[in-house]
Regions:
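Intrinsically disordered, low-complexity terminal
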Residues: 399, 521, 549, 556-565
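Long, low-complexity or tandemly repetitive, helically biased scaffold regions used
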Residues: 479, 486, 504-510, 542
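Heptad-repeat coiled-coil amphipathic alpha-helices that mediate oligomerization/assembly
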Residues: 4-11, 15, 519, 526, ...
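Hydrophobic alpha-helical transmembrane bundles of multi-pass membrane proteins
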Residues: 1-423, 428-450
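Signal-transmission coiled-coil "S-helix"-like helices
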Residues: 447-450, 454, 531, 538
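HAMP signal relay modules and closely related sensory coiled-coil linkers
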Residues: 389, 407-421, 431-448, 456, ...
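Signal-transducing coiled-coil linker
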Residues: 452, 459, 466, 473, ...
Length: 565
């Protein structure tokens, strides 16, 4: 066959491959902007490396498992052909551009595999170790993506049922979301993402403008993602219009919902709404009308909002919203293909009723979720057996730019210095590391604050010692006063009893001896004085009790001072 007439279609396929590859830059920008600055380099590097690893794995074996004839009667997996070594087994029979130029088709499909892998990096960001993610991305390109791809696109059992996923709402996006969900569950949430009561806490993005730029890159790349999934022809323009239209209405759907629920246009949800609309239309861009693409886009955006709220309720920490965008919107896209597919196409091409076709679409989405989550969970667990999956608390606090890659940035140095100083592992002078950089004013302010806190701790320790000494002195005085009071009470009581006996004797002799009457008056006066002295002793006891209470308060104050020290 003379390939010359197909060169324009080949050119479009290669351009589309470049556009899909450019989406990698969009994902890099979205994910780097969504995470905190201290983890941005790690996330960016993962996006670069997962392209390398998944591309290599897809080349080595994955492509053949996906597109070669089924190795079993059911259609579960293709025949292994390492390194594209035998193209005669890779569905090269046909007349369209995909089969005439098999290497160009491989290139296009490899970029799709890259997309499925890179979806995962965002969802598990800020806690998954770099090496663990590299191994996971290899597993995706080698087995997980090719197997479901064979079911749906390689002549497998789903394709035989009549399943339709035009450009990958399930094959790429829902699959990536399922693997992400498994990773999120296995890894757990980031520190501080949920409070002690389970309520979600917002972890701010480092750069929403970068996220917005990434979304625009992705929308631009989606022109090739969907437009290149069919041979160049009259339908290409309609496919591209449906694609961008759904992205626009995805954002509109989110804005309407968010304004109704919050009264504030949330930046991250609106941007994810664009992506949700794009994901949803990807399954059906070639078989639905333009008005239907508007509805699908609206539903895709709404799915992002619903999915985000459900993840918060379930306490699942998806750092960038990958599961709502690619998972929830992916399901919407697959099911809506059955609901909105062109009736003529459905009757002539699929030869099914709408109910039958929609049932097949639902079966396909369930199969995708089950395969992606099940195989993904197993992959995460297997990788965890060989290497550590998650960074430690101190590494998470300082950030993965430094803990994983030792990137010495001023902010990273400052953060590390503050963490070490707070933990008592370094002197506050370590902040001088950044004294000459752009963060020098902030570093000096933090250094001064740490030094003031150190001085306050020393002063608190001194006050605790002083209060302890005062407390000891008061305790001694209290004991001495109590002893003296008891001795005085005993002596005064004895004296009072003796005087009372003398009074009784004088009372009997008063009539016989005039002098006794005078002495009796003196005795009565002395009795009154002794009674007054005895009556005053309880007031001394109460005073000593107040001293004891004051001593207790001094104990509390000294303990508080020791705590501040």
């Amino acid at each position: 066959m003379d390939p010359t007439p197909h060169y324009p279609a080949l050119a479009w396929l290669l351009i589309s491959s470049g556009l899909v590859f450019f989406m990698q830059a969009g994902f890099l920008a979205v994910e780097s902007g969504m995470v905190r600055y201290k983890n941005s380099i790690n996330v960016a590097l993962k996006n670069v490396v997962d392209f390398c690893t998944s591309f290599a794995a897809f080349l080595v074996l994955g492509y053949s498992l996906m597109f070669s004839p089924s190795a079993d009667p059911i259609g579960l997996i293709g025949m292994p052909v390492p390194f594209l070594s035998d193209l005669s087994l890779l569905n090269t029979a046909g007349t369209d551009v995909f089969t005439i130029f098999p290497f160009a088709f491989f290139l296009f499909q490899a970029t799709f595999c890259n997309t499925a892998a890179t979806i995962v990096s965002g969802g598990v960001a800020e806690r998954c170790r770099f090496m663990a993610y590299v191994l996971v991305s290899i597993g995706i390109g080698l087995v997980i993506y090719p197997v479901f791809g064979h079911w749906a696109w390689g002549g497998g059992w789903l394709a035989r049922l009549g399943y339709h996923d035009f450009a990958g709402s399930s094959v790429v996006h829902l699959l990536g979301a399922g693997i992400t969900l498994a990773g999120v569950i296995v890894l757990g949430s980031r520190a501080g993402r949920f409070g002690p009561d389970g309520k979600p806490r917002t972890i701010p993005a480092s750069s929403m403008p970068l996220v917005a730029l990434g979304v625009m890159f992705l929308a631009f790349g989606w022109i090739g993602f969907n437009g290149g999934s069919a041979p160049l022809g009259a339908q290409t323009a309609t496919i591209v219009i449906n694609t961008l239209n759904a992205g626009a209405f995805g954002a509109i759907g989110v804005m309407m919902l968010v304004w109704a629920l919050r009264g504030v246009p949330s930046a991250d949800l609106i941007l994810n709404g664009v992506l949700g609309g794009l994901v949803a239309i990807t399954a059906s861009a070639n078989v639905v009308s333009i008005p239907a693409s508007c509805v699908i886009g609206l539903l895709g955006g709404a799915a992002v909002v619903v999915g985000t709220r459900l993840l918060d309720r379930w306490r699942l920490d998806d750092a960038v919203g990958a599961i709502p965008v690619h998972g929830f919107a992916g399901v919407v896209g697959v099911v809506c293909t059955g609901l909105f597919a062109d009736a003529t196409w459905l009757a002539e091409t699929k030869q099914m009723t709408r109910a039958h076709f929609t049932t097949v679409q639902i079966i396909g989405s369930i199969a995708c979720i089950a395969w992606a989550f099940g195989s993904g969970w197993l992959l995460w667990k297997l990788v965890g057996k060989g290497t550590s999956l998650r960074i430690g608390p101190d590494e998470e606090a300082v950030g993965m730019n430094y803990s994983e890659h030792k990137v010495e940035e001023p902010l990273q140095q400052l953060t590390q210095a503050v963490v070490d100083s707070a933990n008592g592992r370094r002197d506050a002078q370590v902040l001088d590391l950044v004294r000459d950089g752009e963060l020098a004013p902030l570093a000096r302010s933090i250094q001064a604050l740490i030094r003031r806190q150190a001085e306050q701790r020393r002063e608190s320790a001194n006050w605790a010692v002083t209060l302890g000494e005062v407390r000891s002195m008061l305790t001694q005085e209290q004991h001495a006063g109590g002893t003296a009071a008891r001795e005085s009470r005993s002596e005064l009581t004895d004296a009072r009893e003796a005087i009372a006996d003398v009074g009784k004797l004088l009372e009997r002799r008063r009539l016989e001896d005039p002098t006794a009457a005078v002495l009796l008056d003196l005795v009565r006066m002395l009795e009154r004085r002794l009674d007054a002295a005895l009556a005053a002793l309880p007031r001394i006891d109460r005073s000593l009790e107040r001293v004891a209470a004051g001593t207790g308060r001094l104990d509390d104050l000294a303990a508080a001072m020791r705590g501040r020290a």
